[in-house]
Regions:
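Oxidoreductase and adenylate-handling cofactor-binding alpha/beta cores
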Residues: 198-218, 231-243, 284-290
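Flexible glycine/proline-enriched surface loops and loop-helix/loop-strand junctions
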Residues: 184-193, 264-267, 382-385
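N-terminal helix-loop segment corresponding to the beta1-alpha1 unit
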Residues: 4, 10-217, 362-363, 391-392, ...
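Conserved Rossmann-fold dehydrogenase catalytic segment
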Residues: 154, 182-190, 213-229, 245-255, ...
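Conserved PLP cofactor-binding pocket of PLP-dependent enzymes
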Residues: 332-353
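Aromatic-enriched alpha-helical interface/lid elements that frame and gate functional surfaces
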Residues: 258-334, 338, 402
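Terminal low-complexity tails and localization/encapsulation signals of metabolic enzymes
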Residues: 17-36, 247, 264, 346-403
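Glycine-rich beta-alpha junction loops
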Residues: 67, 152-153, 225-230, 267, ...
Length: 403
């Protein structure tokens, strides 16, 4: 997989070590050991994608402007940077360059010459102006894989528009189908487009590395928040074309299944996912509501979906007798797909988190240890480990020609 170009690994490490001391991580870092990545990105989406490559063992160098990646200043922040920056730049080494300065631009060119993958999230027009677009790079480095992530894509009239996760959730219709039926459109509670686009970017790089083994040539990999958002609403697009009806908000429910969603209990909420008639019968028997089994409003999944509001009323009348944890335990024991609604921080003490090893220790923005999710993939039962924290901004006070 690694690029067999003129710049040797020793040259690469020599450049990197001028800013960040090399680390002894052992021989087997992961499946991408030996792959060199130059990461000229900022904010969240593209850095998240290159963090996946780093987790898989790639040697990822995060290149920042002298004033630092904007992600360093995202709240909450302290000390080394922000919580966000710690997450999306883990397992990377770091360097600051002002590529408007000739010397720094030559350094960047040297880094790219020694890389297998070059990751960017500048707008397409800016890449072209800098001579960092795929066409320019391919002429110099035919084996290089250029991976780019933008807001609206590499083509089309809006390719150079700026955009963030929430903006593209609105544009692609995700916000319009999120929230309660009688409420306003809502942004999803996690940055699903940032994380999704970053994941697609990493997947594309892996495919391009595999292809290069056969062709000997690099390729251009691109994705965007817009394209990712479009892919997330595939069901809604298909449903509209089948029924002719506009998409709607259903709260925590689902238009095709019932009961499916979040229900109030005596204390807290539970989430139930019933996708078939046999499971509905099991649920009714488990909660002692035999009358609902033969109720004509709820006899089939289609009936229940059409009458989901009435079904919710009936179920919550029963659920108010116990807490969410009690119901979750009772119904899970019957083999039903149900769980209590938790806070994200509950994962820190969750037994399943502990047993799967999904949470790993890393140095946080305040210099203290914190636990965050590692890569949600294991290889032969082993999860790729965190090898180093996000890099310090080691050259933040360097003068800039525009200061």
């Amino acid at each position: 997989l690694p690029n067999d170009c003129a710049s040797t690994p020793d040259t690469w490490l020599g450049i990197v070590s001028s800013m960040t001391p090399p680390q002894d991580h052992g021989l087997d870092l992961g499946p991408l050991t030996g792959v060199h990545v130059v990461d000229l990105t900022s904010n969240v989406a593209a850095p998240f994608g290159s963090a996946i490559l780093a987790d898989l063992g790639a040697d990822v160098l995060h290149v920042e402007a002298p004033k630092g990646d904007d992600c360093r200043r995202m709240a909450p922040s302290s000390g080394r940077g922000s919580a966000y920056f710690s997450i999306v730049n883990r397992n990377k080494t770091g360097m600051t360059l002002d590529i408007r300065i000739a010397e720094d631009r030559r350094t960047l060119d040297d880094l790219i010459a020694g890389a297998d993958v070059f990751v960017t999230n500048l707008r397409p027009g800016k890449l072209e102006a800098l001579g960092l677009d795929t066409s320019s790079l391919n002429k110099k480095y035919p084996r290089l894989i250029h991976a780019s992530l933008s807001a609206y894509g590499q083509s089309g009239p809006e390719r150079d528009k700026p955009g963030y996760d929430a903006v593209l959730q609105a544009r692609t219709g995700i916000a319009s189908v999120t929230g309660e039926a009688n409420g306003p459109p809502v942004r999803a509670g996690v940055s699903i487009l940032d994380v999704g686009a970053g994941t697609w970017l990493a997947l594309g790089v892996l495919a391009a590395l595999y292809e290069r083994q056969t062709t000997g040539r690099g390729s251009a990999v691109s994705t965007s928040l817009f394209e990712t958002g479009a892919s997330w609403v595939a069901y809604h697009l298909a449903a509209h074309q089948v029924t002719g009806k506009p998409s709607q908000r259903h709260g925590s429910g689902h238009p095709a299944f019932a009961p499916y969603g979040i229900y109030r209990t005596q204390r807290g909420e539970i989430c139930i996912g019933i996708g078939g008639d046999h499971l509905f019968r099991e649920l009714c028997e488990a909660i002692g509501r035999y009358d609902l089994i033969d109720d004509e409003r709820f006899r089939s999944n289609g009936d229940r979906a059409r009458n989901s509001g009435e079904l919710r009323t009936e179920l919550e009348r029963t659920f108010e007798s116990k807490s969410a944890l009690e119901w979750a335990s009772q119904l899970s024991d019957r083999g039903l797909p149900v769980d209590a609604v938790n806070q994200p921080e509950d994962l820190l003490t969750d037994r399943q988190s502990r047993e799967t090893g999904i949470l790993q220790e890393i140095v946080g923005p305040d210099g203290r240890g914190m636990r965050i999710p590692g890569l949600p993939i294991t290889f032969d039962g082993e999860r790729p480990r965190f090898r180093m924290p996000a890099p310090d901004l080691s050259d933040a006070d360097r003068p800039s020609p525009r200061d």
